[in-house]
Design a protein with these regions (language model features):
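Cofactor-/ligand-binding subdomain signature composed of acidic, glycine-rich
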Residues: 1-78, 100, 124-136, 140-146, ...
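Hydrophobic alpha-helical scaffolding
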Residues: 34-37, 80-84, 154, 158, ...
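Structural signal for hydrophobic packing residues in well-ordered secondary-structure cores
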Residues: 52-59, 98, 102, 168-176, ...
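Structured core elements
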Residues: 82, 105, 266-268, 306, ...
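Glycine-rich beta-alpha junction loops
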Residues: 111-112, 271-274, 311, 337-344, ...
Length: 403
């Protein structure tokens, strides 16, 4: 205790009532036409492109895990694969506004988070910056392997191949992986883009990310920290401990000068309704609405909000507002991001705990379909443009997988 604080018995024993504010649930309702003043055609299409890259990456892994082949390429990989097909919009929306100085720590199924943050970084960095990163990373070994794939027409395309090849090689335990294959699927990361590891321990990123946020705070470092977790992690004590640590009163009451203020950390929960085979809401958890938990942590209720993770623009809208709070010293923040995984907990999961009717109902809101349709209807681009992106994405992924 650095300071002695008087605990007033009269204040402690005073009668009264606690009051709580309303917590917003899925309040975003803007149309594409309304968003055209905030996003260019290139912006809209880049969001779709990044979602398509992630979907194809996960589709490729699913095919290899279940059929030992992808587009005629035979390969067997016995390692784990926790896929995020269906969660692309949540990951891309989150990463869209984040910079290199913003760190993301992954959830239990973090391929989409790794790729989304990396693709966002590639878009923001200059060609010279990208080349320097690729040339200097592990002595340029991964870059040299990527350059052998064939000619490219831009540095950014080279960087996209680099991140896909390095991530896939890491998952397949190959030496050209970002960490020589030692991390694998559950511990893949790429620090030059602010992508920190995910964790095989459910909820394990929460205390680690909180430590990173404390590091940024005490050392006056730029950027914020995003702790990603699944809704299943809310049954784990370290997650609550991390949120409490990040929200300690002393940051606002005892720390002085420019050090006064909350921790720069956003606890984002990818709320896909399941923790392995257990249904969280209505079965294994007690919160009913996950965003409610913020009310039990801080008087500000952690600025908690429930958002539609099937709409990347809704996620970007929420991230913009929450980033302002964090940069103004008003953290921590809690986001309950609704999403859904179309594959099982892992590729060996038979999905016995959910019905085909449920899966089909959620697939009607597949972000790859609904976001594309919204852009076509708003005349941002025609179907041919989207078909070209998909074809290019499949061709690139096939080339990388073959090598």
């Amino acid at each position: 205790m650095p300071k002695c604080q008087f605990v007033d018995p009269n204040e402690a024993r005073k009668p009264g009532k606690l009051s709580f504010k309303d917590i917003d649930l899925n309040q975003y309702n803007k149309t594409i036409a309304e968003e055209k003043k905030n996003f260019s055609t290139e912006d809209f299409m880049r969001i779709y492109h990044d979602m398509a890259v992630i979907r194809e990456f996960e589709t490729m892994l699913y095919s290899i895990k279940t059929k030992s082949e992808y587009n005629g390429i035979e390969y067997s990989n016995p390692g784990p694969a926790h896929l995020s097909m269906g969660q692309e919009a949540s990951a891309v929306g989150q990463a869209y506004l984040l910079g290199i100085d913003d760190y993301t720590f992954g959830s239990h199924r973090s391929h989409s988070e790794i790729l989304a943050k990396s693709l966002s970084s590639i878009n923001k960095l200059s060609d010279d910056e990208l080349m320097k990163i690729m040339e200097n990373f592990i002595g340029g070994r991964t870059l040299r392997a990527v350059e052998k794939l064939g000619k490219v027409d831009s540095v950014k395309e080279l960087a996209i191949r680099f991140i896909l090849y390095g991530t896939l090689s890491e998952i397949f335990a190959r030496q050209n992986g970002f960490h020589m294959g030692l991390g694998g699927s559950m511990h893949a990361f790429f620090l030059p883009f602010g992508v920190y590891p995910n964790n095989a321990i459910v909820g394990g990123s929460a205390p680690i990310a909180t430590g990173a946020a404390l590091y940024k705070k005490v050392n006056r470092k730029n950027g914020i920290v995003v702790c990603n977790a699944g809704d299943g992690s809310l049954g784990c004590g370290p997650v609550y401990e991390a949120m409490n640590f990040a929200a300690m009163d002393q940051f606002r009451t005892l720390w002085e000068g420019d050090m006064n203020g909350g921790m720069p950390i956003l606890f984002n929960v990818f709320d896909n309704s399941y923790g392995m085979g257990g249904q969280t809401r209505g079965e294994t958890m007690a919160y009913d609405m996950l965003a409610r938990l913020g009310a039990g942590i801080t008087p500000s209720q952690m600025h908690a909000e429930r958002i539609d993770g099937f709409n990347p623009l809704a996620v970007i809208d929420a991230m913009e507002r929450k980033l302002k709070l964090l940069r103004n010293g008003e953290g921590p923040v809690l986001l309950d991001t609704i999403t859904y995984r179309y594959s099982g907990h892992s590729t060996s999961d038979q999905n016995a705990y959910r019905s085909k009717e449920e899966l089909d109902a959620w697939k009607e809101y597949d972000p790859m379909v609904t976001y594309r349709k919204a852009l076509v209807d708003a005349k941002v681009a025609d179907d041919g443009k989207f078909d070209d992106i998909v074809a290019e994405t499949v061709e690139r992924m096939t080339m990388i997988c073959r090598h």
